[in-house]
Amino acid sequence: MSRQLLRGTSLQRAANVVAATSSRPMVIQPAHPMEHRSPLQQQQCKLTPSIVIRRWKSFLHNNNSSAQTAAATTAEAATVTVTATPRRSQAETLNARGSHSPFDAPSRCMSTKSQNNMKFVTIDNINANFKAMEYAVRGPIVIRAGEIEKELLKGVKKPFDRVIRANIGDCHAMGQKPLTYLRQLMALTMEPRLLNSPEYPEDMKKRARDLLDACLGGSTGSYTDSAGIEFVRRQVAAFIEKRDGGVPCDYQNIYLTGGASPGIKSVLSLLNCTVDGKTPGVMVPIPQYPLYSASLTEMGMTRVDYFLDEDNCWGLDRKELQRSYNEAKKQCNPRVLVVINPGNPTGQVLTRKNIEEIIKFAYDNKMIIMADEVYQANVYDKNSKFYSFKMVMNEMGGPHRTQELISFLSVSKGYLGECGIRGGYMEVINMCPDVKAVLTKSITAQLCSTTAGQIAVSALVNPPQPGEPSYELYEKEKSAVLGALKERAKLVYDTLSTFEGYTVNPVQGAMYVFPKIEIPAKAVEAAKAKKMHPDVFYAFELLETTGICIVPGSGFGQIPGTYHFRSTILPQTDLLKEMMKKFGVFHTEFMKKYQ
């Protein structure tokens, strides 16, 4: 599924055509995508990444293809799910390639009668929304990167000696070291006998004892309240009040979650209700983080796209919000507005004025705001500042203080980067008490998030304070992480800005750069010949030539006719410099090849 591209349905492509000829582009995802697809497209949707890779390997074995041919073949397979071009017959394929393509309509992907006799659950009788789900940052390009890593271990010769995974915001995987105080706190709570060890500072021991006292039976192996350990929720509330300059925060509005994602999905599920015969619509920024598009497809909700202003450093314009809302009303019931600040994949930090405009728009149109604020500690530009939606909303006063809002934070980002521990929280603000009770009931059915994640949240919101034994080391490690990210943000921007045909906005925050590329017409035609999006074609050639793994912009959404990609700024500085150097050489050769 072509890096899990976001424009895979015929309805989606039709909307893109309309958008490309209009000054007001918008894309609306259907509530039930598979129902709008032709039989051919439905069959193509069954080509999962694992099937793509299995066939690719079989094709390599049978045809003894070169690595470059393998790259092109893999890329073609990756985009089969989104193309409207009719598939060639097997005879035509044999004439064209001299052998069967591993991607022609095969019996393994189809539910044959014999297979139906063997299995009660088949590809034809599972949830169609699950089959239609797409998630760009873990698709076939990343799978191909993993295959290349295995090939390198086996001694297969490549023009590079390692894969640089710039495709995902996984801080520790890219070399960031964990902060000492958090790991000490987790060690002490998971193995209480360490509380007697002189190797651990007393402030961490006290924090560990307080957390253990708040756990049933004094053990992190116990269930917690479904909303999370009350002691930690109170710590979160104190953290929010301090962050927002004293704006009150009730700990009973805090839910501890396994990272931000489960909280986001819980809220979307809560709001998944047909009103007046129309499916619920969720407005998401384009470009957007694929969690939203994947979740909405899974739930059968309608995705309503609003476009960020690339020429204004990916800012947000109220007129664009209203245009998107008005058009969506014809087909669905828009009731949720998603805002990601700082932005993923775009790396922008919204101005206070922008946030005020968003709040006014949501209030006027009776929409709830989902504020994805997981990168709030990642602000690098000296002229940018993070403002929480809650604080701005309260300072606006008047009726806007009653705006319904849910905000999210995670230990996966910021300066901790603890992606695998899965800790986070959401705060629900101005929610109807009856609705909140239903949300709580739903979360109760999930039992609770892990105690490890909840302890990590405690560490995030209650770090060492001045005068405590752990404070000096904490400040040193935190400053080193954020300082290095700021340096890399500038390095990536300065380097990519010199590339021919690149337009790059400064990385104001978050962990990503999202440049626009002018891909030569010859390369676009080469991509079309392989049934590929041009940015996917570019990304695969980059991977096979340099070992650099990025995510094509079509996986996040982009204005039709434009091409982008997302790269993280997370590789350690020396590796990032090497990556930028390789990138520059590749791009120069790519432009020469296709001019």
Over which residues does each language-model region extend?
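Conserved PLP-binding catalytic core of the aspartate aminotransferase-like
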Residues: 124, 173-174, 180, 474-486, ...
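N-terminal "arm"/small-domain region of PLP-dependent enzymes with the aminotransferase-like
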Residues: 103, 108-227, 238, 242, ...
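N-terminal mitochondrial targeting presequence
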Residues: 1-121
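Conserved core of the PLP fold type I
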Residues: 189-364, 370, 376-399, 406-407, ...
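Short catalytic/ligand-binding loop motif for oxyanion handling, primarily in non-cytosolic enzymes
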Residues: 172-176, 182, 345-348, 365, ...
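Generic structural signal for small/hydrophobic residues in well-ordered secondary structure
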Residues: 141, 166, 236, 254, ...
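Conserved core segment of the aminotransferase class I/II
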Residues: 112-119, 123, 181-184, 203-210, ...
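Conserved PLP cofactor-binding pocket of PLP-dependent enzymes
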Residues: 132, 141, 163-164, 174, ...
